[in-house]
């Protein structure tokens, strides 16, 4: 695989230039480009420049409104709803996150329901932001069906990621962000592009047979849930929280309404912010740190998010797939 080194500034500039050339206004382009750059910076490459061609396809097909302004509504004392108006998720979150953080600090807990937005990307940026504000953050989202329920061979669920973040005053938060599938679809697609095999148990071919070929999974096959029935049940929970509970589509409904003319279809996200101080009182952070200290002292264990923060400290260039860079340059 040929790669080219790009600095973080070059990644940001390339993403923003491409978005501006394809229908985004300055604010939308700046916010989304920053999200893409941060994903590359932190090693979340399946949510970095890899996603840019799909965003452009969505802009060209008019699924994504590159000039959208989301609308916020306070629907109850601890519930906020944001209508995305076909904006990309980072634009919606720039409005919704500060509001849900303020509300959780005031009331102890707050819910943010996001509707009619496009591609929630990685979830850790929002839960990490919540944790950096001293709150516990939980988020989940669904997408087009790509995952079979346990025992099935056809897709019904999205990869349905969930993210959790725990605040650590004076330290980096503990954050995890994971698909409820055995592997995120973006990782399957990258493995296909780079000619890598995936572990047995990742997915099935379109004939319902196990395979280690990511191409057979991505092209008409299906991903399996992690942990069999356990992961399948968690994926079902995400469908309900990010679908029925907030008045958004289930994954299969999203697929039925998608005309496949390019780019990600719209969907929703469910976010909770909780104040540990309001619930536990003083000393909650020291108590939690005792647990993290115990955990870190065990051989072979690292806290969730440590690798991402280590990547973040590296200010040097990132090696980006050359074919991808050339493709992006052709879009602008």
Predicted regions and their residues:
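Catalytic-core signal marking the mid-to-C-terminal active-site face
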Residues: 2, 6, 11, 21, ...
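N-terminal glycine-rich anion-binding loops that anchor highly charged ligand groups
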Residues: 4-8, 24-50, 64-75, 263-266, ...
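Active-site cofactor/substrate anionic-group-binding motifs, chiefly glycine-
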Residues: 48-101
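Residues forming anionic-ligand binding surfaces in small-molecule and nucleic-acid pockets
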Residues: 73-79, 95-110, 203-220
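A generic, well-ordered mixed alpha/beta core segment in the N-terminal half of proteins
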Residues: 79-169
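Phosphate/diphosphate-binding glycine-rich loops and adjacent basic-rich segments that engage nucleotide
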Residues: 147-215
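Secondary-shell segments that build the walls of catalytic and ion/ligand-binding clefts
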Residues: 193-252, 257
């Amino acid at each position: 695989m040929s790669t080219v080194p790009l600095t973080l500034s070059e990644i940001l500039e390339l993403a923003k230039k491409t978005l501006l050339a394809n229908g985004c206004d300055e604010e939308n382009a700046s916010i989304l480009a920053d999200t893409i750059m941060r994903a590359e910076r932190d090693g979340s490459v399946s949510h970095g420049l890899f996603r840019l061609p799909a965003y452009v396809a969505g802009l060209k097909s008019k699924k994504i409104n590159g000039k959208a302004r989301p609308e916020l509504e306070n629907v109850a004392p601890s519930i906020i709803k944001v209508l995305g108006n076909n904006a990309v998720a980072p634009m919606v979150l720039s409005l919704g996150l500060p509001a849900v953080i303020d509300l959780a600090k005031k009331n102890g807990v707050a819910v943010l329901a996001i509707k009619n937005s496009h591609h929630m990307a990685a979830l850790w940026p929002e839960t990490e932001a919540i944790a950096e504000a001293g709150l516990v953050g939980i988020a989940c989202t669904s997408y087009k069906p790509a995952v079979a329920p346990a025992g099935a061979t056809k897709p019904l669920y999205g990869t349905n990621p969930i993210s959790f973040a725990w605040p650590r005053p004076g330290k980096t938060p503990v954050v995890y962000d994971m698909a409820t599938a055995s592997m995120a679809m973006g990782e399957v697609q990258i493995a296909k592009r780079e000619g890598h095999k995936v572990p047995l148990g990742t997915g099935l071919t379109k004939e319902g047979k196990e395979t280690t070929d990511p191409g057979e999974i991505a092209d008409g096959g299906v991903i399996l849930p992690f942990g069999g029935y356990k992961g399948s049940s968690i994926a079902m929970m995400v469908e309900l929280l990010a679908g029925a509970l907030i008045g958004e589509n289930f994954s299969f409904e999203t697929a039925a309404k998608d005309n496949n003319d390019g780019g990600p279809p719209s969907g929703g996200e469910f976010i909770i912010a909780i104040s540990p101080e309001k619930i536990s009182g003083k000393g909650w952070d020291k108590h939690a740190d005792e647990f993290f200290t115990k955990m870190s002292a065990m051989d072979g264990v690292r806290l969730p998010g440590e690798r991402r923060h280590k990547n973040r400290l590296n200010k040097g260039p990132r090696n980006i797939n050359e074919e991808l860079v050339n493709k992006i340059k052709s879009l602008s």
